[in-house]
């Protein structure tokens, strides 16, 4: 099983970021506009239409306002397993961290999902704050960070 971790520092108050994350039916408007084009609620699930043409059914597993943590699972024939959690942690009054973890099978699709998460993180940064930094558990992301730091 592959596990992908994203740690996104956002220059916005945690309560504002959490409000966008927990709005399960509106990621296309509030959280990742441009990356997600449309979302339709279907009971405890949402049907998400992505800009790349992919459509995914995401089942809401848990939404915990106290811990600012949302958990969802993707229901797909392509994947045996896809569970994700998003947690918003305050870093002072004006900034926060968004911790996004995805566990999936088959592990061969991890590079694709990792790339999609990077694109989503950029859309999040644009929507939620003008200045944000993404830290990833993948070596390619660390190399890119080092490259950018050398300029």
PLM region descriptions:
Residues 5-7, 47, 57, 71, ...:
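Beta-strand secondary-structure signal
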Residues 25-78, 83, 119, 130-136, ...:
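Glycine-rich portal/gate segments that line the openings of hydrophobic small-molecule binding cavities
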Residues 1-40, 145-151:
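Hydrophobic ligand-binding cavity/cleft-lining segments
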Residues 11-15, 62-66, 88-97:
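A short, structured loop/turn motif at beta-sheet edges
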Residues 74-127, 135-138:
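Beta-strand/loop substructures that line and gate deep hydrophobic ligand-binding cavities in soluble
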């Amino acid at each position: 099983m592959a596990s992908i971790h994203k740690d996104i520092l956002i220059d916005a108050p945690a309560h504002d970021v959490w409000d966008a994350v927990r709005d399960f039916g509106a990621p296309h408007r509030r959280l990742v506009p441009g990356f997600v084009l449309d979302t339709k609620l279907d009971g405890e699930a949402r049907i998400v239409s992505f800009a790349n043409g992919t459509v995914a059914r995401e089942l809401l597993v848990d939404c915990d306002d106290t811990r600012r943590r949302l958990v969802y699972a993707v229901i797909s024939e392509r994947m045996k397993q896809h569970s994700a959690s998003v947690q918003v942690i305050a870093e002072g009054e004006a900034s926060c961290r968004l911790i996004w973890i995805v566990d999936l099978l088959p592990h061969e699709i991890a590079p694709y999902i990792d790339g999609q998460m990077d694109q989503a993180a950029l859309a999040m940064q644009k929507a939620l704050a003008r200045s944000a930094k993404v830290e990833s558990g993948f070596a390619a992301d660390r190399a890119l960070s080092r490259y950018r730091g050398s300029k």
